[in-house]
Design a protein with these regions (language model features):
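Pseudouridine synthase
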Residues: 51, 158-221, 232
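RNA pseudouridine synthases
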Residues: 1-166, 186, 204-206, 231, ...
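A generic structural motif
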Residues: 108, 170, 224-226
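Residue-level detector of flexible, active-site-proximal loop/helix-junction positions
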Residues: 151, 197, 227
């Protein structure tokens, strides 16, 4: 199967692709689909659609301020502040590690039931403009927990069967591509990851399900509200394309409400 045979990883968006998850006077939280950039990027200068502009449309045309990153191929919870001061306070909380973030990922193989990945990462792993420059190496820590496993009778990479796991990921730091790079580091790359994954496994799922999305979804954030001081628990359910692929886990769909 050639690259030209693969379904397009970046769908065209019609209407506003964001789904509102939470709104108050100071914050707007949405579900971002896979394939949508959060904001303009010098690497993707040709792109014309961004979550930032769609969120602004949901905010009556008023400015919104993204307070954290979400990679283009990652779907899920994305939080905007509705004023600069709230953005500053919440941004500092993120930098201080005071925000709990949860993700779901489908990975190749069966990792241990739970574990901690404490593996420093370089600043710009895929930016060719920085390849000849010395890059700082920063501490990076991710906790993971295995939620479900499956084995399918499909021979990939020379094995008679192929194993996959659904895992919950909790990053304690926020390095670029941290979860994707950490799962690659422990030899359990995320399905659909064209930078750090396994090509043959990615091709199998793209061919089977008709899309080549990254199987990584931001599902929850817990933090102290930057204005009211209350504990805010935000949650975004995985979207249909993500849940479709999870059908290989059988009855996992029946427990959708219990997914972290």
């Amino acid at each position: 199967m050639s690259h030209s045979d693969l379904p397009a990883p970046c769908p065209a968006f019609y209407g506003n692709p964001l789904t509102e998850v939470y709104r108050d006077q100071w914050l707007l939280a949405v579900h971002k689909p896979a394939g949508l950039l959060v904001h303009r990027s010098p690497i993707d200068r040709h792109e014309t659609e961004f979550a930032l502009q769609y969120a602004r449309a949901m905010n009556a045309g008023e400015h919104v301020y993204p307070v954290h990153r979400l990679d283009r191929p990652t779907s899920g919870l994305l939080v905007f502040a509705r004023d600069p001061n709230t953005a500053s306070v919440l941004g500092k909380a993120l930098m201080a590690g005071a925000v709990q973030k949860s993700y779901l990922a489908m990975v190749r193989g069966w990792p241990q039931q739970e574990g901690v990945i404490n593996h420093p990462l370089r600043e710009h792993p895929t930016d060719r403009r920085c390849k000849d420059e010395p890059q700082p190496i920063r501490d990076a820590l991710t906790r993971y927990r295995r939620l479900a496993t499956t084995e399918i009778p499909v021979a990939i990479e020379g094995y008679p069967v192929s194993r996959y796991s659904l895992v919950a990921l909790h990053p304690a730091t926020g390095r670029k591509h941290q979860l994707r790079r950490h799962m690659q580091h422990i030899s359990h790359p995320i399905i659909g990851d064209t930078n750090y994954g396994r090509t043959k496994h990615n091709h199998y799922f793209a061919q089977t399900f008709g899309h080549s999305r990254l199987m990584l979804a931001a599902t929850a954030m817990v933090f102290t509200h930057p204005v009211t001081g209350t504990t805010l628990k935000l949650r975004a359910e995985p979207d249909a394309s993500f849940m479709q692929v999870l059908s290989i886990f059988g009855d996992i769909l029946a427990t959708r409400g219990s997914l972290p």
